[in-house]
Amino acid sequence: MSFESNEYFDGNVKSIAFQSATLPGTLGVMDIGEYTFDTNAYEFMTVVNGALTVKLPGATDWKTFNAGETFEVEANVSFDVKVKVQTAYLCLYK
Amino acid sequence: MSFESNEYFDGNVKSIAFQSATLPGTLGVMDIGEYTFDTNAYEFMTVVNGALTVKLPGATDWKTFNAGETFEVEANVSFDVKVKVQTAYLCLYK
């Protein structure tokens, strides 16, 4: 068996797909930078190490999520992320 | 930039290397199975999602670590791991 990995934004974001005990997920790392992500499913994004500063859909302000914190994003929307230190995250899809 | 990823045990363990705010680290996924890891540095292993049942160096019993729990391993030793569900982990090296 081999886990599938994916790269985005010219390799600045890299993730490995896996099947958790409950939901499909990806485990990934983001380099320093700013990104806009599009969702295909409802997402539970947890910061594992580092921090993500996020502008959620419909929001006007940015909110920073640190290690251990989770934010949720609806399916079929976009959200913006600013990364100031290489950050590890876990995303579970519902 | 592109993050370096590595595979072990015929792809049953896959990780991405990154530089956290404090220490170098890897973020990885283990498939169901049993593995013996050799350490080159002092390791802080944190279970991100799933569980790892571990026999630490010199130990006779196995201990299960769940999501959010961390175990530490000296450099230049081996430790055994049993994985019963695909498990995501973070390893920081000192």
From Swiss-Prot, chains A, B:
Which Gene Ontology terms of cellular component type are present? cytosol
Q: Which GO terms describe its molecular function?
A: guanosine phosphorylase activity; purine-nucleoside phosphorylase activity; thymidine phosphorylase activity; uridine phosphorylase activity
SUPFAM superfamilies with a match to the protein in the record: RmlC-like cupins
**Record's Gene3D superfamilies?**
Jelly Rolls (2.60.120.10)
Q: Which domain of life is it from?
A: Bacteria
Q: Which family does it belong to?
A: Belongs to the nucleoside phosphorylase PpnP family.
> What's the protein here called?
Pyrimidine/purine nucleoside phosphorylase
Identify the gene encoding this protein: ppnP
